[in-house]
């Protein structure tokens, strides 16, 4: 009996040994795969990063977002005051995770749309073309053209941070956006872009979806590069958190130089700050309480949104736009502080230009005085002047006419090489009192934007 049992026990021991080895090996492989895999939406990042570039032709800024399944880069215009992400889907949109929510669904309510959409472009269903879905209006922020498209949801991914380095990808599996009409990309935008990325204060803007999904502090930071060949970035999350500010090189110097002013948000979700006066070389351009410059809320001359806070921050104007009455006084005061013999014929769209050689000694800086007299945004050097032609430098401000969205609309040329913090949690905007370049820094060397 014992002899008959011996072979059986031997076989059993061998089987158990192989089973143990298999389980151990499988466990190790599983741990290895998990360690090397990209974090998904279940991971909770501290800070998210989107690299941004300047377009050489339009001087506007754009970035590549990662969307769809499998993930692919989609170039989109940066629209600070836009309500949502919109892209064109009529051609080359391929994704196994694309969905079009039904009309009157929860997603429609979240996007604040109660309009149903019926596609008439095709008899075959495709991304952007389904029936009985939600309709969502998208706008080209440069031309102001609008069109009705389909509310959609799909995967979106952004890079997290890992210490001072760019980290791995995290995903939102059901990110809401709009499949917009193709004609919206045909005018005014950089040639390569397929849509616009809205960062405004709206239910399904990129920041709000990121804050909600990942539990980030309601804050994002913008740093736009002044060169098409180098990157800037948008950071989503709290840059003042000790776990995060390691990502910003020389963060103590940069963050220490920041000042804050109250943030006002219009009914359209646009970002405004109060500019009480403009100063040129110690000469005040606009008195603090001048109703002709900044209409009061009782004035009916302008739209309500143009009367909130005085100055709107934008990324869809390459240069700062001033209401005509402000522009006239401002350029007159500026011209009085520059030798008259240096002035030359203006080059459009600018109203005041100079012979570059004759102002080589410099021009006066421009101070935007905020709600308090000691909170000042100084615009000087490359942020102030534009090389319009060979040998011709122009003041980088444009006459917007009588009826403008805001008395002042800060453009990208004045925002470049400056760290601008939109602290929505505390209703304030932070900025460097001087350009990063005055500290020998730039947006391109402030962050590590190389893929991990």
Swiss-Prot record:
Briefly state the modifications made to the protein after translation: Glycosylated on alpha chain at Asn-131; identified N-glycans bound are Man(2)(Xyl)(Fuc)GlcNAc(2), Man(3)(Xyl)(Fuc)GlcNAc(2), GlcNAcMan(3)(Xyl)(Fuc)GlcNAc(2) and GlcNAc(2)Man(3)(Xyl)(Fuc)GlcNAc(2).
Disulfide bridge map: 89-179, 103-116, 108-134, 119-129, 353-394
Known role = Sulfur-rich seed storage protein that remains undegraded at germination. The uncleaved form exhibits some inhibitory activity against GH11 xylanase from T.longibrachiatum, more at pH 7 than at pH 5.3, but not against GH12 xyloglucan-specific endoglucanase (XEG) from A.aculeatus. Binds to model phospholipid membranes containing dimyristoyl phosphatidylglycerol (DMPG), dioleoyl phosphatidic acid (DOPA) or mixture of dimyristoyl phosphatidylcholine and dimyristoyl phosphatidylglycerol (DMPC:DMPG), or mixture of dioleoyl phosphatidic acid and dioleoyl phosphatidylcholine (DOPC:DOPA).
Q: What induces it?
A: Secreted in high amounts upon heat treatment of mature seeds. Strongly induced by chitosan in the cotyledons of germinating seeds.
Q: Does the keyword Transcription regulation apply?
A: no
What is the designated name of this protein? Gamma conglutin 1
Gene Ontology cellular-component terms for this entry are: extracellular region
Family per record: Belongs to the peptidase A1 family.
Q: Which GO terms describe its molecular function?
A: aspartic-type endopeptidase activity; enzyme inhibitor activity
Q: Name one Pfam family in it.
A: TAXi_N
Q: Give residue ranges for domain Peptidase A1.
A: 61-432
* InterPro entries (alphabetical): Aspartic_peptidase_A1, PEPTIDASE_A1, Peptidase_aspartic_dom_sf, TAXi_C, TAXi_N, Xylanase_inhibitor_I-like
Residues carrying a glycan: 131
Site Required for inhibitory activity against GH11 glucanase — annotated at: 439
**Location of the protein in the cell:** Secreted, Extracellular space
> Is Disulfide bond among this UniProt entry's keywords?
yes
Annotated source species: Lupinus albus
Q: What residues correspond to the site Cleavage?
A: 296-301
A Gene Ontology biological process annotation? proteolysis
| Top-level taxon in the UniProt lineage | Eukaryota
């Amino acid at each position: 009996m014992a002899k008959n049992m011996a072979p059986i026990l031997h076989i059993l021991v061998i089987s158990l040994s192989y089973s143990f080895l298999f389980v151990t090996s499988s466990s190790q492989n599983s741990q290895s795969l998990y360690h090397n895999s990209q974090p998904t939406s279940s991971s909770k990042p501290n800070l998210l990063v989107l690299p941004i570039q300047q377009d050489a032709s339009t001087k506007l800024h754009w970035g590549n977002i990662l969307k769809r399944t499998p993930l692919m880069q989609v170039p989109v215009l940066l629209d600070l005051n836009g309500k949502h992400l919109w892209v064109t889907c009529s051609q080359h949109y391929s994704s196994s995770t694309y969905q079009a929510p039904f009309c009157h669904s929860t997603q429609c309510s979240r996007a604040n749309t109660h309009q149903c959409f019926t596609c008439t472009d095709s008899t075959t269903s495709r991304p952007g073309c389904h029936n009985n879905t939600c309709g969502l209006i998208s706008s080209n922020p440069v031309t102001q053209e609008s069109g009705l498209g389909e509310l959609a949801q799909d995967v979106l991914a952004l890079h997290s941070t890992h210490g001072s380095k760019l980290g791995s990808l995290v995903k939102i599996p059901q990110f809401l956006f709009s499949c917009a009409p193709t004609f919206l990309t045909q005018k005014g935008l950089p040639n390569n872009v397929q849509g616009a990325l809205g960062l405004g204060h709206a239910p399904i803007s990129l920041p709000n979806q990121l804050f909600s999904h990942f539990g980030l502090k309601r804050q994002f930071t913008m740093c736009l590069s002044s060169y098409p060949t180098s990157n800037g970035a948008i950071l989503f999350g709290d840059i003042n958190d000790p776990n995060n500010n390691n990502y910003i090189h020389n963060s103590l110097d940069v963050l220490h130089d920041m000042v804050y002013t109250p943030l006002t948000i219009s009914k359209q979700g646009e970002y405004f700050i109060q500019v009480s006066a403009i100063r040129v070389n110690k000469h005040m351009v606009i008195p603090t309480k001048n109703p002709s410059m900044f209409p009061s809320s009782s004035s009916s001359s302008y739209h309500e949104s143009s009367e909130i806070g005085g100055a709107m921050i934008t990324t869809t104007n390459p240069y700062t736009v001033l209401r005509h009455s402000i522009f006239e006084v401002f350029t007159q005061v500026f011209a009085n502080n520059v030798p008259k013999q240096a002035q030359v014929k203006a080059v459009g769209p600018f109203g005041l230009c100079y012979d570059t050689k004759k102002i080589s000694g410099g021009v006066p800086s421009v101070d935007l005085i905020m709600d308090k007299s000691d909170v000042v945004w100084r615009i000087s050097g490359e942020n102030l002047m534009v090389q319009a032609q060979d040998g011709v430098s122009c003041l980088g401000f444009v006459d917007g006419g009588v009826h403008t969205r805001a008395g002042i609309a800060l453009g990208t040329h004045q925002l470049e090489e400056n760290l601008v913090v939109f602290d929505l949690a505390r209703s304030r905007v932070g900025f460097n009192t001087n350009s990063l370049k005055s500290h020998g820094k730039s947006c391109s060397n402030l962050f590590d934007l190389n893929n991990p």
